[in-house]
Regions:
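Conserved nucleotide-sensing/catalytic segment adjacent to the nucleotide-binding pocket
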Residues: 1-43, 48
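A short acidic, glycine-rich active-site loop
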Residues: 1-6, 93-101
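Alpha-helical scaffold elements adjacent to nucleotide-binding pockets in ATP/GTP-utilizing enzyme cores
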Residues: 10, 14, 79-82, 98
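Short, intrinsically disordered, mixed-charge
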Residues: 17, 85-88
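Short, basic, glycine/proline-bearing loop/turn elements
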Residues: 22-25, 90-95
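ATP-dependent NMP and nucleoside kinases share a basic, alpha-helical "lid"
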Residues: 36-86
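NTP-dependent small-molecule kinase module
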Residues: 63, 68, 72, 77, ...
Length: 132
């Protein structure tokens, strides 16, 4: 199943209830290099909380969890350049062979881009390495 590699139930237990109530919460941080939880992160109550990530708009969360849904679009070339700069050539190979195709299949299967009211188009890295 596209997007099936995420533990949505844990998100529903640890994060969603507090988001709905505007309360502080803690969640377990998953370390993909160890394939295990690696501590917790505390999130204070705030007037605005951003939930980001490739799978954060899965239909599992279509029950009014978010006030605004935004899609961050990036060209394949810019995406690969950023992965290479951030993670190195070996990781880029893994991303190209596994993670990018999985994310693309998920986004297409569930119409993620089309379900968003806001589209943010990434710009290529500038001379200073800055990007939007």
């Amino acid at each position: 199943q596209p997007g099936g590699n995420v533990h949505y139930e844990r998100f529903a237990e640890e994060v969603a209830p507090a988001l709905r109530l505007g309360q502080a919460f803690c969640y377990g941080v998953f370390d993909c290099s160890r394939m295990a939880l690696a501590g917790t992160r505390a999130v204070p109550a705030a007037p605005l909380t951003v939930v980001e990530g490739a799978y954060s708009l899965h239909p599992f969360f279509s029950t009014g969890l978010y006030d605004v849904r935004a899609y961050y679009a990036i060209s394949p070339e810019a995406q690969k350049a950023r992965i290479l700069a951030r993670n190195g050539p070996a990781a880029l190979c893994a991303f190209e062979g596994k993670w990018i195709p999985m994310e693309n299949a998920y986004a297409a299967a569930f119409g993620i881009r089309e379900s968003c009211g806001v589209l943010v188009q990434a710009q290529p890295c500038g001379a200073q390495g800055q990007h939007v």
